[in-house]
Amino acid sequence: MEAPTVILDTCALVLTSMEDAPLAAARFTFAAARHAVVDLAQVLNTSPTTGVNRLSSAEFAQVRGRLAAAGIRVQESTASEQKLEELRATYELFVSALAERIQVSLPPWIPPADVLDDWQTSAWDDQFPSIHQTLNKVMHPQ
């Protein structure tokens, strides 16, 4: 459930909080991803879960700050946070129920520090330390 959730989160953020964003692409992608999630919930006979909130106001401010630091223009109004909350309410209840049903966790909006992404590690890292070193050099140049 991580991939569709990240897609929905990203589209929702683009649609509600970013300036000069590709809105048409975000709308289409959001609609397709939400449709897939809702259909999957229906196929698995999984009722939506209420009371889900994966993003607090403090975390939203942190997300905004990270985007701004990366040079992405974001809307600073409280209206954008409200719109994001409303849009999240259209899919979080489904992804939360599905995650519970198939016993996986949902991704946080803000990743924990010092945790490697799945693509950055493998079961063979101990045998090939140069791979990890190369990835670090390329992905985190100093």
Which residue stretches match the model-derived regions?
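Soluble C-terminal extramembrane regulatory/interaction domains of multi-pass membrane proteins
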Residues: 3-142
